[in-house]
């Protein structure tokens, strides 16, 4: 027995030593020896998702002569989170997402909902411009009119009524309708009310101008257009293995062809890491001190999905419920109309899953590989401080098929198991961040990372993500290229996004013009709720210069 304990103690000590060695291993990429006369490209985009595609499109319009490179590890673009089946396809506008509004001291706070709504207005303007330029094809190939409905029952009815009363004071939510009449809700969303208990107290709000968006389609169309530019080059099946700074302050991005095994590198003045969940891990390769404050926590999602015409014909809406008290934002249930590649589906979820992968097509070693001496303590601290999230994930992972069906029946009482299949969605990585003088926190939104000189940027986090990609990338341009966005790029940016630098929540006239223009261009449903509606519905509003 003593001999066994001795060996066990030695084994434990060896494991501890190995763990310490692992945590203190070098993370940053080694500097690559490059020739002085080696050509330098203007921008490298890591990842072939909607963020890189959107940023690349901005670049080619602002600087047509720039040399741009895009690297994607899969054999096609838009196969991770941007793929139509890997996300819920919501054009997030704050119309129905009740987690964007909260009641504090008896007052309903709607600022976050206004922020998200304003950002999606930027997205619609960007896509409208691309349609006008012939970059994006027929709008119905990527966006379709689908009303957004917030639906509650029981004690949440009072919350929704207060939310509605607060929201209609903002121009962004004018035209929202509220009802407690089951017959009206049945007209709006028949599936939700079919065979529902008639004694149950229910309420709903509805915004007609809502939409369903296929972000995978947008990504592919943008990249297809980029490929027509001789200054742009896409390499698929190519994994970025290193990002290191050169003595002249340029950067070298090293990569490997996953089909041939060949390695190579490119020198660049600017790097954008738009690799979804893998962004945290890739950012660590830079060795930038600012990158050490980040870690990632991976969470997956599953959806129940049906393409049964008898069901899809009864539902043309995105219906969001309210998360249970204490549940994380990712737990908000919704039953959605989806249009993917010309076919109509109804989707319900999400149901959280857990995996150590940072990407759907990633490795189970991703979480471990991202752990190092700089972030192991903050990861541990955040884990201990978010036991409710851990408990929620465990409860979700333990759900049976019957449990998931019962959740669906809260929103579609007549649901039958044989009509639905379980579909694995994309992988998201929530940010764990430690700022100087502040405790480490787990964050549920998106965040732009920019080095001090703006030469290295990344997008970290998850929702709302894709739906506000044009706004997010515009914000990134401002952080990385402040002189250009204020100077020579300014006029073009106002041409692309008419409301650029304007606060639509405080300018109902401009908001109305913008919504009439984008709705006409994109085929969305919009009836002006303002008395002084602009008569020139389809005409693009005039941009205001800075």
Swiss-Prot record:
It catalyses: (S)-malate + a quinone = a quinol + oxaloacetate. Its EC number is 1.1.5.4. It is an enzyme of class 1 (oxidoreductase). One of its GO terms (molecular function) is 2-hydroxyglutarate dehydrogenase activity. Keywords: FAD, Flavoprotein, Oxidoreductase, Tricarboxylic acid cycle. GO terms for biological process: tricarboxylic acid cycle. Belongs to the MQO family. NCBIfam families: mal_quin_oxido, PRK05257.1-1, PRK05257.1-4, PRK05257.2-1, PRK05257.3-2, PRK13339.1. This is Probable malate:quinone oxidoreductase. It comes from Acinetobacter baumannii (strain AB307-0294). The lineage of its organism: Bacteria, Pseudomonadati, Pseudomonadota, Gammaproteobacteria, Moraxellales. The gene is mqo.
